[in-house]
Amino acid sequence: KEKLEKYFKLTETALTEVKKNIISGKESNAKEIIDMVGNYISDAHHFENKDDWVNAFAALNYAHGWLDAGARIRLFKVNDSRLFTVDDES
């Protein structure tokens, strides 16, 4: 449960970061990613409330995967390697 709380915080922090850093002209695609992430986080909370830690953790991993994908295809201008699989200053 402690790890789950850690990953909720990490993923929710990353989501907040991408919402503030959408690259101009890519808002529509970014919104799709953000919506999917929100859905998976919601699912994770649902599973957590049912004490289904495995599926809660899986949903969080999917959520974060969507964030990383959006960062990699440059929908978001992010460069925090603690939150994303990119660390690009350009």
Enumerate the language-model features and the residues they cover:
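Long, charged/polar, soluble alpha-helical segments
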Residues: 1-90
